[in-house]
Amino acid sequence: MQPPHPSESARAFFAFHLKRHREGKGWSQPALGAKIHISGSMVSGIELCTRRPTLKVCQKLDEVFGLSQFFEALYPRVVEETGLPAGFPEFADAEAAAGMMKLYESFVITGIFQTEDYARAVLRAGQQPDKLERLVAARMERQEILRREVPPVVTALLDASVLRRRFGGREVMRAELEHLLTLAEWPHIHIHVVPEDAELCPEGSFTILSSMGEPDAAYAEMAGGRGRLIDDDGYIAELGVLFELIRSKALNAEDSQAAIRKALEEL
């Protein structure tokens, strides 16, 4: 696979200069990865434009190559091209480093659990085809954290209505629910369905991230799909209390899987 020409996009420009600097040092992709604490495969992905660098990676690259904020200055342009909402790229960076994730989703199956077809259906409204595919690719890229050697522990609370709210038609929804059942078997993923008659009315969906040695972060999505990154300790603590309240109303793991299977049968 050949990377795109550096004139095509900020990401391609970034990739071209990353490879140029790496080869100038005589370093292999794994060797560079070891120096900046990422895998050689991620270095390869960045150079092929299939992976987006995080802000921390940009800063580390400048450090090891002895550059004055060259890659860091490119980061906002790379993020801008993804079409992600304000605050979300920073959240995605924090998500990639998280050791634990707690999330509540009230409208759709959460992004890191979505199949490509389901994600495309969810994101399609009002998007130009090229931007849509960038958004889908970014969402699929985020899911790689679930498959890494030491994945985060994820506890997901899904409102029961998301199991019946169809995106993309019957077959797309069927594949999505089957995928959800597969994920529920993974030891680091805990999925709980919140019954529709639970006496709760949270304002919107949210995710809380925890990392060893780092302060917690959160992302809250409100009506209309607008979201914001949260680093206020008090607000994050309130979300933690809300998460536990919702979890107290949710089904256990076994009953949650039964609810997903029932939704499958009713398609």
Q: What is each of the regions a protein language model found here?
A:
Residues V43, T82, P202-S205:
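Short secondary-structure transition/capping segments
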Residues M1-V79:
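Basic, Lys/Arg-rich alpha-helical nucleic-acid-recognition elements, primarily the DNA-binding modules
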Residues R52-T54, F65, F91-A94, P215:
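Short, structured secondary-structure boundary patches
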Residues M1-Q2, R11-F14, S28-G33, E80-T82, ...:
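Short hydrophobic/aromatic-rich motifs at helix boundaries and adjacent loops
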